[in-house]
Design a protein with these regions (language model features):
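Catalytic toxin/effector domains delivered as secreted proteins or via bacterial secretion systems
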Residues: 2-132
């Protein structure tokens, strides 16, 4: 799958650090090779295929992150389920500006109320194990 770092001169990425462990709606579910059993991490900053997306699940199989890549293979936006500055996890979106990931745009609140219905409807099929 690639690493979260450098391109090789011959094309593609440095040594493989990710493996595919499944799919949801034709989007590959990735797992970082060698990650501690209870750790999750984040998806790579670059995708192997222009315009692709990947999904990362928590070790218990629940949704953690969806990352969409642009035609330049760089991360475009993330949909995350986590406690970003909150006591309870909530669904939120980060869009990338260069390598920066600005403050999240909530899709749900910590109570599970849907705030951005159009984004929720578009991505709800990827939210394995998330109960709102």
């Amino acid at each position: 799958m690639g690493s979260s770092g450098s391109y090789l001169k011959s094309g593609g990425f440095t040594s493989q650090e990710w493996e595919q462990v499944g799919e949801i709606k034709s989007v590959k579910i990735l797992r970082k090779i060698g990650l501690k059993k209870d750790a999750t991490g984040n998806l790579p900053l670059y995708g192997n295929t222009p315009g692709t997306a990947y999904i990362l699940l928590k070790p218990n199989g629940r949704f953690h992150q969806f990352r969409q890549y642009g035609e330049d293979r760089k991360a475009k936006f993330d949909i995350d389920y986590g406690r970003h500055n909150s006591a309870k996890p909530y669904l939120h979106m980060h869009t990338y500006s260069g390598k920066d990931r600005p403050e999240p745009m909530p899709i749900t609140n910590a109570k599970g109320d849907i705030i951005n219905k159009s984004l929720y409807e578009k991505y709800k099929g990827f939210l394995k194990g998330i109960k709102l």
